[in-house]
Amino acid sequence: IVGPSGAGKSTLFELILGNLKAQRGTIHVENCAMVFQDPYSSFHPSYTVINQIKDVASLEGMESYLETMKLDAELLEKLPHELSGGQLQRCSILRALLMKPDLLLLDEPTSALDNVTQLDVMQMLMKHLGEMAMLLITHEIDLAKWCADEIIEIG
């Protein structure tokens, strides 16, 4: 999903998640996970990252994800504010994948990552396309063309 700022891309995700009520019609989605643009908004500041992952997901398969996303397991023992934005965003993606959702919503998930890590993370996400559907919000049209089956332009 691409479009200018303020076009309603994130609002669409809020509707899908049920955080906003549709004025007409209904939206019904089960087993959905989301990676927000700002990773600090999705982690409680007083609990370690690993505890917040364990609260919502199984840790099965975590080692391979850690390697792909260039994350050290020791980072997961830290509090969110002790990590860089890029590290915490990768932890957010890790948590979402470990939830094994049917639908993964990605709101600018790699905007805080350097180009090399961004490519690694997107390639890793692409490996899981057969396991789940993904909706990606991005301002980067080249990224959308590279990874999407379909592109929806809003605005």
Q: Language-model features: where?
A:
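Conserved ABC ATPase signature
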Residues: 79-83, 87
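Helix-to-loop junction immediately C-terminal to a conserved catalytic motif
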Residues: 17
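Q-loop/switch helix immediately C-terminal to the Walker
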Residues: 38, 45-61
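Conserved H-loop
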Residues: 131-137
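Catalytic Walker B motif of ABC-type/P-loop ATPase nucleotide-binding domains
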Residues: 104-108
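A short, proline-enriched helix->beta-strand linker immediately N-terminal to the Walker B motif
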Residues: 98-102
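Hydrophobic anchor residue at the start of the ABC signature
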Residues: 93, 121
